C-alpha cells in the first residue's frame, strides 16, 4: 500500500498447499456492476458542432511495425476528442452521433487535415512513415471527397505516396460504384488503399478484385 499497489493477498516462499488454501479462503467474489449504456458516453450534436468549431480533435497514432525488420513503417491516425474540461474521449463518443446527424464528412475532413499536417511535419524531420486514415462509405460517396482530399494534401504539402485511405470491408457493398470511383481516383493520385477487417464482411473475392486496394488488414 505504501507503494501505491493493491493486492488481494500474498504468499511467502516456500509455497505449500496449506498456504494456497489459506489464501483462497480470503477470496471474496464480487459481481461487477452493470456496464453503463454506451450511449451515455455519446456527445450531443450541439457538443460536436461546438467542438469542431473549437478544434477539439486530437489524434493519436498507432504504429505499424515491419514483422521482419521490426522497424516502424507507418501509423494509423486514431481520433480522440478533447472536452472543454480537458478530458479525452474515444471515437465511440463522437462517430455514431456524427453519422446520425450528417456531420461525418465534416468530422472526416478535420481529421484528415490534421493527419496530413502531422505527416508533413514528420517528413520535414526526416521520417517517411505512411499514415492511414479511416473513411466511412458516406465520406467516399460525397461528390466533393476527392477535391477535399486534394486540397488538404496541397495545403499540408504531404506526399501522396505516404497516404493510405482505409475503409472497412463490410461496408464496401454499400454504393459500390461511387465508392470505387472515389478510391480509384485517389489511387491514381498515388494514395494507398487499405481494406480494414478483411474477412469479417461479405464481400466476394470477385468484388474485391474490382477495388484498387494496396493492402488488406
Q: What does each model-found stretch correspond to?
A:
Residues 59, 75-79, 105-107, 131-133, ...:
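Hydrophobic faces of well-ordered beta-strands that scaffold small-molecule active sites
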Residues 6, 15-24:
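C-terminal output helix
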Residues 1-10:
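Alpha4 helix (beta4-alpha4-beta5 surface) of REC/receiver domains from two-component response regulators
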Residues 95-96, 105, 184:
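Conserved long alpha-helical elements within nucleotide-processing catalytic cores of c-di-GMP signaling
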Residues 103-178:
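Catalytic core of bacterial c-di-GMP phosphodiesterases, primarily the EAL and HD-GYP domains
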Residues 24-40:
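The C-terminal output helix
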Residues 36-97, 134, 195:
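Active-site core of bacterial EAL-family cyclic-dinucleotide phosphodiesterase domains
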Residues 152-217:
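The catalytic core of metal-dependent phosphodiesterases that act on cyclic dinucleotides
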Amino acid at each position: 500500500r505504501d507503494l501505491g499497489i493493491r493486492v488481494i493477498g500474498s504468499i511467502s516462499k516456500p509455497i505449500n498447499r496449506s498456504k494456497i488454501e489459506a489464501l483462497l479462503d480470503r477470496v471474496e467474489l464480487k459481481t461487477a456492476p452493470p456496464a453503463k449504456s454506451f450511449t451515455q458516453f455519446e456527445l450531443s450534436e450541439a457538443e460536436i458542432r461546438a467542438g469542431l468549431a473549437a478544434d477539439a480533435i486530437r489524434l493519436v497514432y498507432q504504429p505499424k511495425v515491419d514483422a521482419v525488420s521490426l522497424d516502424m513503417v507507418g501509423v494509423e491516425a486514431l481520433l480522440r476528442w478533447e472536452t472543454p474540461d480537458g478530458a479525452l474521449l474515444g471515437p465511440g463518443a463522437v462517430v455514431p452521433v456524427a453519422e446520425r446527424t450528417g456531420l461525418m464528412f465534416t468530422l472526416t475532413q478535420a481529421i484528415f487535415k490534421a493527419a496530413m499536417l502531422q505527416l508533413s511535419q514528420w517528413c520535414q524531420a526526416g521520417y517517411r512513415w505512411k499514415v492511414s486514415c479511416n473513411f466511412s462509405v458516406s465520406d467516399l460517396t460525397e461528390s466533393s471527397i476527392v477535391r477535399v482530399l486534394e486540397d488538404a494534401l496541397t495545403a499540408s504539402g504531404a506526399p501522396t505516396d505516404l497516404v493510405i485511405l482505409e475503409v472497412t470491408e463490410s461496408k464496401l457493398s454499400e454504393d459500390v460504384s461511387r465508392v470505387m470511383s472515389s478510391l480509384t481516383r485517389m489511387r491514381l493520385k498515388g494514395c494507398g488503399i487499405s481494406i480494414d477487417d478483411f474477412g469479417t464482411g461479405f464481400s466476394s473475392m470477385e468484388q474485391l478484385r474490382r477495388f484498387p486496394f494496396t493492402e488488406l488488414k
